[in-house]
């Protein structure tokens, strides 16, 4: 079990330039809890799961004076809540002639809720109340095969099948992995590998909110972000 709680965080930002002078006060409370359970058998079976709970509540006040004499201000309250569950089962076993087999399955479900509500808005500044409730599911199946030879040569291949959904987006994909190490002499070793790396966007990046850093700079969330996949082939 791990947990953290950081209440009453305060940040003040003052910006002065040719176009505007602004002041932003921001208050944040963050809380995170994680529980992990694992079981390791004596015959190659591993089972586990975890649950993560995260909340972030924030409030912001902005006041800006512009060069043309106009003014803008607002108060905003917002928050983010994440519930994430995951389970997995892995099995490893030895085959004949020195081969090793592995296979398993994993499932992850995450729910990300975030909102922003504006009040006391004055001046020519565009504000919009937002609410987002994302649901993400990832199911993986994998199988691997490997062997180490007495000569020092080793070989391993694996493939992971994934079904990923978030909102109305659904995707099936297969991610291969392979590596070969050929040992001829201590000074002559040949290596070849194929790897697949998948990067998931953070839940913070997928928020639907708009954040004002000052009177003219805005940060927009990107709720339609999707995972990115990289394939790498290396030899030496």
Show where each model-derived region lies:
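Primarily recognizes Gram-negative and organellar outer-membrane beta-barrels
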Residues: 1-236
């Amino acid at each position: 079990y791990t947990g953290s709680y950081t209440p009453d965080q305060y940040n003040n930002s003052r910006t002065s330039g040719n176009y505007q002078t602004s002041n932003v006060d921001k208050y944040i409370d963050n809380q995170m809890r994680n529980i992990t359970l694992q079981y390791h058998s004596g015959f190659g079976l591993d089972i586990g799961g975890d649950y993560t709970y995260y909340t972030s509540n924030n409030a912001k006040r902005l006041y800006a004076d512009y060069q043309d004499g106009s003014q803008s201000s607002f108060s905003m309250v917002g928050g983010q809540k994440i519930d994430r569950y995951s389970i997995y089962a892995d099995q490893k076993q030895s085959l004949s002639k020195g081969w090793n087999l592995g296979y398993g399955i994993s499932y992850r479900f995450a729910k990300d809720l975030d909102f922003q509500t504006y009040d006391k808005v004055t001046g020519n500044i565009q504000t919009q109340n937002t609410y987002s409730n994302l649901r993400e599911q990832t199911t993986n199946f994998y199988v691997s095969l490997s062997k180490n030879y007495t000569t020092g040569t080793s070989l391993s291949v694996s493939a992971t099948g994934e079904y990923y959904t978030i909102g109305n987006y659904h995707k099936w994909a297969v991610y291969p992995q392979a590596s070969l190490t050929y040992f001829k002499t201590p000074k002559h070793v040949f290596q070849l590998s194929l790897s697949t790396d998948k990067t998931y966007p953070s839940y913070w990046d997928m928020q639907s909110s708009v954040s004002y850093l000052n009177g003219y700079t805005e940060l927009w969330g990107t709720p339609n972000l999707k995972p990115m996949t990289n394939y790498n082939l290396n030899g030496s």
